[in-house]
């Protein structure tokens, strides 16, 4: 039995990046041998075990062959006869197909270290094209390592084009696709993820609405990527970044994209609201008090102040591209605070209830906003 550290832990150590999760590969062992040593099986599709003390994942060496469509369309074979080289060749990129033994020696049959040094994301074998999820993974890695100068190898990009043209991307589940999108959006240069998807034709398959933004007389797509990059530079949360990407789409299109990937509820809601109201955000100080109150009501600022704050931030990301200050931020925050400060208690004590109470509260808030605007 030989045990190797594999994948991201080896790659990131060689890059001098922090290593968070460590994956281990076991060659020459059986399921029974692993269990006899106290390892707990957790893999439903292939033998993966948790270490009895550290809780880290240990997988038996395995091979795989294509048996159906999509990410899950594979048959796996794990046995003590599977070699280290046979296991590593099934991996996506050469930089992820390196292993380190117990002595710290590097095992690199597919020249991942060379590609690492040359800053190239290159597929290990032609089997790369059998898994459509790898298109999203490579685009995500391109975004992650863009600050270090990495690029996708031409021949790998060509394979990604073939996958995109095959229709296999449409076999991916919403959950798997969203997981990659979410992780990519939270990288330092998430716009690179979209650029790579567009370069290989995957954006047209997965998000035709966003892809179409690049084909008008004025490229709204380039603007969307600039806003997304700005949001990342300002370390905005996921919901704001998602809203920035979709900002230029119409409400119906945003809803369609949201549902296609089953985005989290907070991401869906913010994207729709930002798409509909960001122009009002930019014109905040020109809005009549009635429109300003209506905007606050739409966002339910009384119960969900954080969502309105994220709306303000998305608007600010859009405006910052012009190098301008954004006084609308403080103006909108002040308006929300003014409306929230209206005390409902005196109205209730006066005996108002139901619709009458609601109408009086709205009138009081409008009066407060009129005074706020007049300052």
From Swiss-Prot:
Disulphide bond pairs: none
Top-level taxonomic group: Bacteria
Organism field: Pseudomonas entomophila (strain L48)
Sequence similarity: Belongs to the tRNA nucleotidyltransferase/poly(A) polymerase family. Bacterial CCA-adding enzyme type 2 subfamily.
InterPro entries: CCA_bact (IPR012006), NT_sf (IPR043519), PolA_pol_head_dom (IPR002646), PolyA_RNA-bd (IPR032828), tRNA_CCA-adding_enzyme (IPR050124)
Signal sequence annotation: none
Enzymatic reactions: a tRNA precursor + 2 CTP + ATP = a tRNA with a 3' CCA end + 3 diphosphate; a tRNA with a 3' CCA end + 2 CTP + ATP = a tRNA with a 3' CCACCA end + 3 diphosphate
Further facts: A single active site specifically recognizes both ATP and CTP and is responsible for their addition.
Cofactor(s) demanded: Mg(2+)
Enzyme class: transferase
Binding site for ATP: 8, 11, 91, 137, 140
BP GO annotations: RNA repair; tRNA 3'-terminal CCA addition
Job of this protein: Catalyzes the addition and repair of the essential 3'-terminal CCA sequence in tRNAs without using a nucleic acid template. Adds these three nucleotides in the order of C, C, and A to the tRNA nucleotide-73, using CTP and ATP as substrates and producing inorganic pyrophosphate. tRNA 3'-terminal CCA addition is required both for tRNA processing and repair. Also involved in tRNA surveillance by mediating tandem CCA addition to generate a CCACCA at the 3' terminus of unstable tRNAs. While stable tRNAs receive only 3'-terminal CCA, unstable tRNAs are marked with CCACCA and rapidly degraded.
Protein name in the entry: CCA-adding enzyme
Chain sites annotated for binding CTP: 8, 11, 91, 137, 140
């Amino acid at each position: 039995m030989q045990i190797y550290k594999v994948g991201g832990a080896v790659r990131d150590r060689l890059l001098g990046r922090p290593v968070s999760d460590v994956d281990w590969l076991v060659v020459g062992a059986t399921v029974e041998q692993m269990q006899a040593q106290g390892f707990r099986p957790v893999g439903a599709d292939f033998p993966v075990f948790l270490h009895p003390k550290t809780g880290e994942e240990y997988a038996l060496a395995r091979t795989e062959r294509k048996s159906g469509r999509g990410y899950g369309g594979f048959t796996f074979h794990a046995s003590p006869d599977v070699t280290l080289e046979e296991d590593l060749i099934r991996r996506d990129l050469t930089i992820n197909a390196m292993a380190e033994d117990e002595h710290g020696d590097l095992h690199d049959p597919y020249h991942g270290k060379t590609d690492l040094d040359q800053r190239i994301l290159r597929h290990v074998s032609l089997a790369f094209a059998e898994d459509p999820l790898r298109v999203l993974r490579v685009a995500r890695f391109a975004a992650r390592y863009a600050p270090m100068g990495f690029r996708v190898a031409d021949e790998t990009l060509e394979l990604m084009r073939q996958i995109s043209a095959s229709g296999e991307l449409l076999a991916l589940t919403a959950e798997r696709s969203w997981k990659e999108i979410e992780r990519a959006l939270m990288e330092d240069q998430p716009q690179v993820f979209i650029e790579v998807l567009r370069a290989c034709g995957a954006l047209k398959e997965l998000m035709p609405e966003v892809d179409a933004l690049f084909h008008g007389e004025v490229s709204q797509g380039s603007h969307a990527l600039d806003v997304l990059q700005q949001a990342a530079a300002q370390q905005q949360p996921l919901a704001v970044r998602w809203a920035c990407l979709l900002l230029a789409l119409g409400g119906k299109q945003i809803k369609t994209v949201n549902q296609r990937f089953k985005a989290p509820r907070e991401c869906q809601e913010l994207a729709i609201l930002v798409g509909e109201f960001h122009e009002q955000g930019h014109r905040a100080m020109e809005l009549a008090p009635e429109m300003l109150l209506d905007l606050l009501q739409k966002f339910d600022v009384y119960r969900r102040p954080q969502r309105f704050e994220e709306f303000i931030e998305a608007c600010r990301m859009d405006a910052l591209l012009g190098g301008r200050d954004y006084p609308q931020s403080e103006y909108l925050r002040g308006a929300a605070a003014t409306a929230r400060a209206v005390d409902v208690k005196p109205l209730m004590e006066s005996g108002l209830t139901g619709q009458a109470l609601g109408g009086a509260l709205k009138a009081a808030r409008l009066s407060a906003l009129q005074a706020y605007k007049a300052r």
